[in-house]
């Protein structure tokens, strides 16, 4: 499955290139240059100055045209604007190169479907950069919730205004992370979706603030709120369960579990010292950088011929739900399973 020349050994480092050296692409180059099982071959960007600076920093090659990079690598990380994902992604896959592409997988559902098909037709790995899956806080949260009965989940993802990612709405920039997470955690067909949104400026093309409610067949209710204009950065998921309340802070890598117990009194010769109403558990999490874990996983999948934990099929389902949420926020319509087969949009059990 690997795109290897006859003279290369299976145990040689995976040769990787980075296409698109904006903010995220520079981080990809940085991490890849540190991975022991990867060899950063080169970078490509429309900005010659930026591309050459990054290449010089990591002592690799710079390519004005990314097509010239493809014969030299086994895999690429694509961090170009979303509108270019389809063209660049399909070109790389057809060239026999494995692909990690930043989220969202594509600008439209049709383009995403073709990317998934192209990867399958050419027997190439297609991983999508839903980086929160590799956040230590999420990985520990998923372990905790496997032993709980979830009633409702709240996901809050807020950021101050920035010039970054202004070519998409807050749904595709920020909320899409939590959509992917919720689908993974709940693992049940969707039966209802409602959403509302707002813009900083009425003339703005894209929504800056969106809140959505998703009803699942198993009874779980998920409420997602994302903002690009909040004066405080926030990345939190709260799970209301029958036996606990779990709060996870993805920014500070912290998980707290609150449990109510039968009230106990501690006494000293008949004198009440204190009353115990409940207790808080703090879950241990590692300090590994999520991007490091994500790229290491990608390299291992290429080396070992394994499908990634966040492949094209999963990312396509996430994109479908994100598109429906944005549409619902724009027109105010509530979607139910009787109106649209939401079961086909995201059945997390197939993740």
What are these regions (language model features)?
Residues 1-10, 75-77, 124, 297-351:
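C-terminal helix-rich "cap/oligomerization" subdomain common to oxidoreductases
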Residues 1-58, 182:
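N-terminal Rossmann-like dinucleotide-binding module
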Residues 28, 58-116:
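Beta-loop-alpha module in the N-terminal Rossmann-like domain of NAD(P)-dependent dehydrogenases
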Residues 64, 78, 101, 126-128, ...:
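Hydrophobic residues in well-ordered beta-strands that form the structural core
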Residues 106-165:
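A contiguous active-site-proximal alpha/beta segment in oxidoreductase catalytic domains
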Residues 162-221, 226-232, 238:
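Rossmann-like dinucleotide-binding domain that binds NAD(P)(H)
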Residues 220-293, 311, 339, 344, ...:
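NAD(P)-dinucleotide binding in Rossmann-like oxidoreductases
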């Amino acid at each position: 499955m690997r795109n290897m020349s006859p003279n290369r050994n299976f145990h040689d480092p995976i040769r990787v290139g980075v296409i698109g050296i904006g903010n995220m692409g520079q981080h990809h180059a940085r991490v890849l240059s540190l991975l022991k099982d990867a060899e950063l071959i080169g970078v490509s960007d429309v900005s010659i100055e930026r591309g050459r600076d990054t290449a010089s920093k990591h002592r690799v090659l710079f390519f004005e045209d990314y097509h010239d990079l493809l014969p030299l690598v086994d895999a690429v990380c694509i961090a170009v604007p979303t509108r270019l994902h389809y063209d660049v992604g399909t070109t790389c896959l057809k060239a026999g190169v494995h692909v990690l592409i930043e989220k969202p997988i594509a600008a439209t559902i049709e383009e995403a479907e073709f990317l998934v098909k192209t990867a399958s037709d050419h027997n190439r790995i297609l991983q999508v950069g839903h980086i929160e899956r590799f956040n230590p806080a999420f990985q520990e949260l998923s372990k905790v919730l496997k032993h709980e009965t979830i009633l409702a989940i709240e996901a809050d993802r807020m950021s101050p205004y920035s010039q970054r990612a202004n070519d998409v709405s807050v749904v595709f920039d920020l909320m899409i992370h939590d959509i992917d997470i919720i689908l993974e955690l709940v693992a049940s067909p969707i039966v209802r979706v409602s959403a509302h949104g707002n813009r900083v400026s009425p003339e703005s093309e894209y929504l800056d603030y969106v809140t959505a409610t998703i009803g699942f067949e198993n009874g779980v209710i998920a409420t997602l709120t994302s903002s690009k204009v909040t004066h405080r950065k926030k990345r939190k998921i709260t799970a209301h369960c029958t036996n606990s309340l779990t709060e996870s802070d993805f920014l500070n890598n912290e998980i707290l579990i609150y449990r109510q117990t039968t009230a106990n009194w501690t006494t000293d010769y008949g004198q009440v010292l204190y009353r115990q109403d409940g207790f808080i558990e703090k879950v241990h999490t590692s300090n590994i950088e999520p991007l490091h874990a994500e790229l290491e996983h990608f390299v291992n999948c290429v080396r070992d011929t394994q499908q990634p934990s966040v492949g094209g099929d999963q990312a396509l389902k996430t994109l479908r739900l994100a598109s429906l949420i944005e549409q619902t926020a724009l027109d105010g319509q509530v979607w139910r399973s009787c109106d649209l087969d939401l079961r086909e949009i995201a059945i997390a059990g197939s993740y």
